[in-house]
Amino acid sequence: MNRILIIAFLLLTATAFCGERETIRDAHGKVVGTATTDGNKTVYRDAHGKVTGTATTNGNKTTYRDATGKAVGTATEAGNRTTYRDAHGKTVGTATESGNKTTYRDATGKTSGTATNTGNGTTYRDATGKTVGTKR
């Protein structure tokens, strides 16, 4: 379950610089998708290039949509903390940044994983510290 949460957070929180494409890999280095940002919109694709969803940012709020365009959730930033909500507004998790590390917690506050940024990418780990993916 934690692996699924981390991969979901990875896909939901993957950001890129304007016009830049980032490759998302699993723990074994296999490409599982990409995130391409242009302006305030990010398009997520699976390993085969099929669109799996989008994210549009306006101010401190990002709205996530599935491949059909249906809103599936939001992320609202306040300082170093981001709160994730489902399509009904219920909190499903948070992300708190401290230095080069982001800690992800579920709705109950239990740590579900971390992301550590380095000069050349991000490494994602589950609650036990096991690497579950990377982004370059």
PLM ranges: what are they?
Residues 4-15:
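Sec-dependent N-terminal signal peptides
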Residues 19-136:
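Repetitive, compositionally biased segments used for assembly/scaffolding
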